[in-house]
From Swiss-Prot:
CDD domains: TM_PBP2. This is Putative cryptic phosphonate transport system permease protein PhnE2. One of its GO terms (cellular component) is plasma membrane. The chain crosses the membrane at residues 3-23, 39-59, 68-88, 93-113. It is a multi-pass membrane protein. C-terminal fragment of the PhnE protein, part of a phosphonate usage operon that is cryptic in K12 strains. Growth of K12 strains on phosphonate can be observed when it is used as the sole phosphorus source after a 60 hour lag period, suggesting the operon is activated. An intact PhnE in strain B is (AC A0A140NFA3). Part of the binding-protein-dependent transport system for phosphonates; probably responsible for the translocation of the substrate across the membrane.
Amino acid sequence: MLALFIHTTGVLSKLLSEAVEAIEPGPVEGIRATGANKLEEILYGVLPQVMPLLISYSLYRFESNVRSATVVGMVGAGGIGVTLWEAIRGFQFQQTCALMVLIIVTVSLLDFLSQRLRKHFI
């Protein structure tokens, strides 16, 4: 799980830096022209342009990490992946089916909630 966290942090940092570099300079210059300090330039000029992308990227990476956690768990990192792997290895088909349904419902619910959050914030 630490590996997923480190990888996600790196990816989100890179995407955020790319988003900040691609902002429109007009709003920042307008805020600077009013005599705002650097913090106010960031709060009112940069963040409003970057937040929709940051929210979207963060939700995507969260969804991706939930899916990846199952696979990583199957190879020994723990969690529901280990339980699923043990059920598969033990030919416990009812438990395997129940776990698969649980995983599918969880991922589908997260996708639905993520979609709703994107519509609300973006």
